[in-house]
Amino acid sequence: MQIEKIDFYGMSAIHFEAGGYEAIMIPEIGANVVKLSHKASGTNILRTPAEDEIETFKGRPQVFGLPLLFPPNRIEDGTYSFENRTYKYPITIPAQNNYHHGIIKSQPFIITRTETGNDYVEIE
């Protein structure tokens, strides 16, 4: 199991391996695993952007990879609280007064912790 920083077409990326699979995530683009492959067979599981598709990927990251969707589903009234902190989001479904998920698929983030085990990788 390993986690390492790599260059992915000029962008800083994280390459990680566990359980016979390898993956790439680009934190500056968002929480989207842009590559997932089975190492032994060489099978690519996700649509990974090629170098000439990077601008398309930046504009429409949902077309490639596997976006991590947080928070799931909808947030009633666009507000929730966690650990004594209240988070407010814009209402994106006015008819239901809800905010819809998908907020981190294209938001840059900073990795604060990594961990590897015999058959897993954790990235926060």
Located regions from the model:
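Surface-exposed acidic/polar loop and edge beta-strand patches at domain peripheries
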Residues: 1-124
